[in-house]
UniProtKB/Swiss-Prot annotation:
Name of the featured protein: Transmembrane protein 106B
Membrane topology per record: Single-pass type II membrane protein
Name of the coding gene: TMEM106B
Native species: Homo sapiens
Family: Belongs to the TMEM106 family.
Entry comment describing in which tissues the protein is expressed: Expressed in the brain, including in the frontal cortex (at protein level). Expressed in lung epithelial cells.
Role of this protein: In neurons, involved in the transport of late endosomes/lysosomes. May be involved in dendrite morphogenesis and maintenance by regulating lysosomal trafficking. May act as a molecular brake for retrograde transport of late endosomes/lysosomes, possibly via its interaction with MAP6. In motoneurons, may mediate the axonal transport of lysosomes and axonal sorting at the initial segment.
Region (Disordered): 1-20
Disulfides per UniProt: C214-C253
Length: 274
């Protein structure tokens, strides 16, 4: 810290002595100023000392690429200053990562739209599967239990639920039977199920004249034309959809009959509603 000062030589004259004193004072002033500045620097160093730590009590400094070390346990207390031009502040392939992220998002969105986009649910009325006939002779009434068959096709990539099937049968513009089935089944993705439903019908009262026709022995086949109406309600993702169809169908009211599905026994008068 301190500096050693050399002894000044004695001067022979007053002028030389004066000059010597002046020079000595100036030199002392410079020395004191230098000492003061040096003390100030030492004070700064004492406040912010630079210490190099080595050994087991230090870890590699993450901001100086391994050239310096900081005490272990102080990683969360020290702050490192990194130049703005440091390459670590400019990650490589940023554009590539952004483009890849955008591409992945678009791909996932496209797949979600493709698989979740609602597609049609096809309902095909196959025909009458069977008809069981009974009579009430006193009331001249005909009872027909008609079993029909539907094919329901799910064209979606997710399951749909057949919530209910509502059916009715008309004869000569008069409703002679109704039926409703609830909570039918669940159809898987791209799957098809065949569903049978039975509609009990009654031909009586103002149509009692049909009793004579249906019980006439001289006729082997007692076909009557009935209009079959069916509405299928399906649900998926909280959305309900109804598909309706109407068909005219021949039914034998003179005997119990089982029909071969696929062989045309009905008249396709009305097209299914789209």
């Amino acid at each position: 810290m301190g500096k050693s000062l050399s002894h000044l030589p004695l001067h022979s004259s007053k002028e030389d002595a004066y000059d010597g004193v002046t020079s000595e004072n100036m030199r002392n002033g410079l020395v004191n100023s230098e000492v003061h500045n040096e003390d100030g620097r030492n004070g700064d160093v004492s406040q912010f000392p630079y210490v190099e730590f080595t050994g087991r009590d230090s870890v590699t400094c993450p901001t100086c690429q391994g050239t310096g070390r900081i005490p272990r346990g102080q990683e969360n207390q020290l702050v490192a200053l990194i130049p703005y031009s440091d390459q670590r502040l400019r990650p490589r392939r940023t554009k590539l990562y952004v483009m890849a992220s955008v591409f992945v998002c678009l791909l996932l969105s496209g797949l979600a739209v493709f698989f979740l986009f609602p597609r049609s649910i096809d309902v095909k009325y196959i025909g009458v599967k069977s008809a069981y006939v009974s009579y009430d002779v006193q009331k001249r009434t005909i009872y027909l239990n008609i079993t029909n068959t539907l094919n329901i096709t799910n064209n979606n990539y997710y399951s749909v639920e057949v919530e209910n099937i509502t059916a009715q049968v008309q004869f000569s513009k008069t409703v002679i039977g109704k039926a409703r089935l609830n909570n039918i089944t669940i159809i898987g993705p791209l799957d098809m199920k065949q569903i049978d439903y039975t509609v009990p019908t009654v031909i009586a009262e103002e149509m009692s004249y049909m009793y004579d026709f249906c019980t006439l022995i001289s006729i082997k086949v007692h076909n009557i034309v009935l209009m079959m109406q069916v509405t299928v309600t399906t649900t998926y993702f909280g959305h309900s959809e109804q598909i309706s169809q109407e068909r005219y169908q021949y039914v034998d009211c003179g005997r119990n009959t089982t029909y071969q599905l696929g062989q045309s026994e009905y008249l396709n008068v009305l097209q299914p509603q789209q």
